[in-house]
Amino acid sequence: MLKLIIPTVMLLPLTWLSKTHMIWINTTTHSLIISFIPLLFLNQTNSNLSSYSLLFSSDPLSTPLLMLTTWLLPLMIMASQHHLSNEPPSRKKLYLSMLISLQISLIMTFTATELIMFYILFETTLIPTLIIITRWGNQPERLNAGTYFLFYTLVGSLPLLIALTHTHNTLGSLNIMLLTLTARELTDSWSNSLMWLAYTMAFMMKMPLYGVHLWLPKAHVEAPIAGSMVLAAVLLKLGGYGMMRLTIILDPLTKHMAYPFLVLSLWGMIMTSSICLRQTDLKSLIAYSSVSHMALVVAAILIQTPWSFTGATTLMIAHGLTSSLLFCLANSNYERTHSRIMILSQGLQTLLPLMALWWLLASLTNLALPPTINLLGELSVLMAMFSWSNITILLTGLNMLITALYSLYMFITTQRGTPSHHINNMKPSSTRENTLMLMHLFPILLLSLNPSIIAGLTY
């Protein structure tokens, strides 16, 4: 694992030692090279974690998430260039250092084998994200958003720490490899049910589950572009990853406990999709669509069949790339119109025709058009849900319909119509932006050729 962690750590001195005009080139190039390292971890056997060391190892569940995390750093750096253009060099370097330290802690979180280690790193990701939101956000409300983000995450994860120490006392170890061998089956007693709640609540707040999702739209709307990208693409996936990892400890109690949470996530999926139809704020719409997609992942993980796990992993990767792409597009609109209101940026297709193509492709991937991996993930989850209970097909089918509606509503509102009067002079789309959009779409299209590499543990 050090062959991934050490080069990423070395990005920090690289950032601070680069000359002012070379900061962007150096960091982007090096982080792009680093993003190819996780490809070495593919094609592993399913039965064991590839044990690189006692503390860090990877398996078919963490490798796709590592690929996503590392691929996102050069994209975040490319996306941030414009809004940092007026900052002094030291401020730029500090910003990049925050992104890199966030990347390091995320890589270590996804590869940690010791659960206490995983918990500490899971909490560490909070600090750089909080600094990025509260220091580089646009509006004064960013402080409020930061408070929400901090307290939701901390309140959720304190019971997790207590539950982990309890498990450590009873089983004597928290190593994932050992737990597969030693974990005992939980009975459905009151104390065990509380422990199950303590374990899953932290991750459900991170996902976020409908009901504890209020921090997400706030954080997304106020964050700068790189903050939004990493929040949507990777930080939400920490919740799903943690829930999948802890199934070993919580089995078979999940079957007793999952029912209310399944209902809540299905209901929340419909509610948040419906909220999207009434949104005027572009970033808020994409944030709520993230909640509705992740609700599907929560439901899939709680069902706990091999098929639903495959669907959940695929959907997490697909959603990470798609929502990050949508935030980039929203940001490119914001940099030109200086407003997040969709109606004010209508008619942009006539002014930026190539951007309209990216918007169309992004909207279509968001509504899970075949042959994208979004569709594969949603279909796997849909089939798993249907075999669990036939009635769920009504809710999930309705959700797919509403998703298609708000994706096309978003596309039509921002691109079609007559341009507003305040858009007289507008910068054309730069090569940097077009490359950025292409680098989001490229993995989505390539993975649809061989989706088995992101299908997770059970494939």
Swiss-Prot record:
It is found in: Mitochondrion inner membrane. Pfam families: Oxidored_q5_N, Proton_antipo_M. One of its GO terms (cellular component) is mitochondrial inner membrane. GO terms for molecular function: NADH dehydrogenase (ubiquinone) activity; ubiquinone binding. One of its GO terms (biological process) is mitochondrial electron transport, NADH to ubiquinone. The keyword 4Fe-4S does not apply. InterPro entries: NADH4_N, NADH_Q_OxRdtase_chainM/4, NADH_UbQ_OxRdtase, ND/Mrp_TM. Keywords: Electron transport, Membrane, Mitochondrion, Mitochondrion inner membrane, NAD, Respiratory chain, Translocase, Transmembrane, Transmembrane helix, Transport, Ubiquinone. It is a multi-pass membrane protein. It catalyses: a ubiquinone + NADH + 5 H(+)(in) = a ubiquinol + NAD(+) + 4 H(+)(out). The chain crosses the membrane at residues 22-42, 60-80, 94-110, 113-133, 145-165, 196-216, 224-244, 257-277, 284-303, 308-330, 341-361, 391-411, 436-456. Core subunit of the mitochondrial membrane respiratory chain NADH dehydrogenase (Complex I) which catalyzes electron transfer from NADH through the respiratory chain, using ubiquinone as an electron acceptor. Essential for the catalytic activity and assembly of complex I. Belongs to the complex I subunit 4 family. This is NADH-ubiquinone oxidoreductase chain 4. It comes from Pongo pygmaeus.
